[in-house]
């Protein structure tokens, strides 16, 4: 499914995204969940932590990383040349990022992303996010706590904004 994880600054979004990427890529044999190809656009090297083009963080064995590449351009490149099942990006924010997410979805790929916001209302009312919400692009919205409870899930909502 296509999901977005949201919180305020330092809420654990990037850490959760990194873990999701690794688990999707590696799969889980005991749960009979095969791994899938994941394409990561790591604009600021926060997910893979690449050094001289080599990821330093484990993002899984079926993960391709575009490091230092603008999100929108990277998403387009991934779907045209790498054929990922899932595209992962950190911190959607610019208009072109949201347009690229729509292109990825229309190509048949799933998207896992993060964005700033501490409630479903925050996300729904962001200028460029609003269009994706109306079109029900994301199947789940995951909200994380911040501060001393960073990374704790506050709530999960479906594409209609209802708690799951």
Question: What label would you give each PLM region?
Answer:
Residues 8-10:
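The conserved Walker
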Residues 16, 20:
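Hydrophobic positions on the alpha1 helix immediately C-terminal to the Walker A/P-loop
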Residues 13:
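Conserved lysine of the Walker
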Residues 25-78:
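P-loop NTPase switch/communication element
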Residues 1-6:
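Short, small-residue-biased leader/transition segments that mark boundaries at the very start
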């Amino acid at each position: 499914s296509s999901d977005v994880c949201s919180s305020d600054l330092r809420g654990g979004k990037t850490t959760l995204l990194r873990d999701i990427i690794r688990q999707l890529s590696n799969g889980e044999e005991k749960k009979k969940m095969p791994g899938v190809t994941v394409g990561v656009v790591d604009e600021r090297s926060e997910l893979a932590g690449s050094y001289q083009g080599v990821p330093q963080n484990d993002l899984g064995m079926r993960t391709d990383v575009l490091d230092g590449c603008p999100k929108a351009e990277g998403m387009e490149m991934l779907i045209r040349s790498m054929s990922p099942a899932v595209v992962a990006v950190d911190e959607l924010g610019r208009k072109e990022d949201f347009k690229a997410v729509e292109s990825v979805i229309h190509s048949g790929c799933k998207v896992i992303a993060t964005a700033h916001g501490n409630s479903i209302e925050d996300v729904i009312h962001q200028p460029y996010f609003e269009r994706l919400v109306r079109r029900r692009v994301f199947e789940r919205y995951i909200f994380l706590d911040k501060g001393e409870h960073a990374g704790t899930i506050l709530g999960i909502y479906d594409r209609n904004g209802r708690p799951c």
